[in-house]
């Protein structure tokens, strides 16, 4: 019986020879028939891979056998069997492209000078103690927050992670600099970097959600501070943490609640936008709001 799984993990640690790690990871993923994306830099590894359960287990076991990766927090979720079109293993200057690689410092323990890590239960303790003074700060692209976010979260106007520096330097969030700010993202990696950038720019009390939305959803499902669906970077495109999840997103055609993104049919655009299955089925073409007036 087929049991497809998806794993997500990252490790910040100094790597003396990223290219050697790339070759090893590529061979390892190919050996176990995995597809997905692995990014390696001098600061560590960031991976999202899918395959059959036993193959993924073997890959994880061998990856953790390398001492710098032995404590990798590997997050598991259900796959569909064809979640990624191919395998990509690359070396890049940054694990997450904020455009601020010179600000990030890592050692064998991880990122130096980042926000205080909060496990899901620690976040609830903070909320009990500080209440409305706590600010959730979304560390993802704004599009991802259209279908799910922490309650009353601040969602910066970002299309890519490169936009965050301009956002936090714009002055529009200066009123948050003396408040407890909890950064969050899908699995935690973006907030490892974002929290450093925010602290370097005068945010005095910065936290990061340990394990990201994934670990929080596993712990509290729909019974905590998370609302809606989680955008994911594979064929599923979204996942939920329990039955009865109410989507925050709405179809651009009919306004019906939906968590389903589709790509604009204009090959020069390919922008993702929300469209329910019924409206997609009823239209031969699917263009985003910017392209439709010009092409339809």
Swiss-Prot record:
Residues covered by the Rhodanese domain: 130-225
Active site residues of this protein: 185 (cysteine persulfide intermediate)
This protein's UniProt keywords: Oxidoreductase, tRNA processing
Pfam families noted in UniProt: Rhodanese (PF00581), Rhodanese_C (PF12368), UPF0176_N (PF17773)
Catalysed conversion reaction: uridine(34) in tRNA + AH2 + O2 = 5-hydroxyuridine(34) in tRNA + A + H2O
SUPFAM superfamilies, A to Z: Rhodanese/Cell cycle control phosphatase
GO MF term set: oxidoreductase activity, acting on paired donors, with incorporation or reduction of molecular oxygen
Example GO BP: tRNA modification
Domain of life: Bacteria
The keyword Manganese is annotated on this UniProt entry: no
EC number: 1.14.-.-
InterPro entries: Rhodanese-like_dom (IPR001763), Rhodanese-like_dom_sf (IPR036873), Rhodanese_C (IPR022111), TrhO (IPR020936), TRHO_N (IPR040503)
Record carries keyword Oxidoreductase: yes
SMART domains, sorted: RHOD
Family statement: Belongs to the TrhO family.
Protein's job: Catalyzes oxygen-dependent 5-hydroxyuridine (ho5U) modification at position 34 in tRNAs.
Record-linked PANTHER family: THIOSULFATE SULFURTRANSFERASE/RHODANESE-LIKE DOMAIN-CONTAINING PROTEIN 2, THIOSULFATE SULFURTRANSFERASE_RHODANESE-LIKE DOMAIN-CONTAINING PROTEIN 2
UniProt xrefs under NCBIfam families: PRK00142.1-2
Cited HAMAP family: TrhO (MF_00469)
Protein name from the UniProt record: tRNA uridine(34) hydroxylase
The organism of origin for this protein: Corynebacterium kroppenstedtii (strain DSM 44385 / JCM 11950 / CIP 105744 / CCUG 35717)
Top-level taxonomy: Bacteria, Bacillati, Actinomycetota, Actinomycetes, Mycobacteriales
Gene label: trhO
């Amino acid at each position: 019986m087929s049991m497809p799984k998806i794993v997500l993990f990252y490790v910040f640690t100094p790597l003396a020879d990223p290219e050697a790690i790339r070759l090893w990871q590529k061979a390892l993923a190919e050996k176990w028939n995995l597809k997905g994306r692995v990014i390696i830099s001098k600061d560590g590894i960031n991976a999202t891979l899918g395959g059959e359960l036993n193959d993924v287990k073997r890959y994880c076991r061998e990856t953790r056998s390398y001492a710098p990766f032995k404590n990798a927090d590997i997050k598991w979720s259900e796959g569909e069997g064809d979640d990624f079109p191919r395998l990509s293993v690359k070396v890049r200057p940054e694990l997450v492209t904020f455009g601020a690689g010179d600000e990030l410092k890592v050692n064998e323990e991880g990122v130096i000078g980042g926000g205080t890590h909060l496990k899901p239960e620690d976040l609830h303790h903070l909320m009990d103690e500080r209440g409305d003074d706590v600010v959730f700060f979304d560390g993802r692209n704004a599009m991802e927050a259209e279908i799910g976010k922490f309650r009353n979260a601040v969602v910066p106007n970002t299309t890519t992670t490169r936009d965050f520096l301009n956002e936090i330097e714009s002055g529009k969030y200066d009123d948050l600099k003396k408040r407890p700010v909890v950064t969050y993202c899908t699995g935690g990696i973006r907030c490892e970097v974002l929290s450093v950038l925010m602290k370097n720019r005068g945010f005095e009390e910065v936290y990061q959600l340990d394990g990201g939305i994934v670990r929080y959803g596993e712990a509290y499902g729909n019974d905590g501070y998370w609302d809606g669906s989680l955008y994911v970077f594979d064929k599923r495109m979204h996942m939920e943490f329990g039955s009865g999840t109410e989507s925050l997103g709405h179809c651009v055609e009919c306004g019906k609640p939906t968590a389903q993104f589709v790509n604009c049919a204009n090959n020069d655009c390919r922008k993702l936008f929300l469209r329910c299955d019924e409206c997609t089925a009823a239209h031969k073409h699917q263009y985003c709001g910017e392209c439709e007036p010009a092409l339809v």
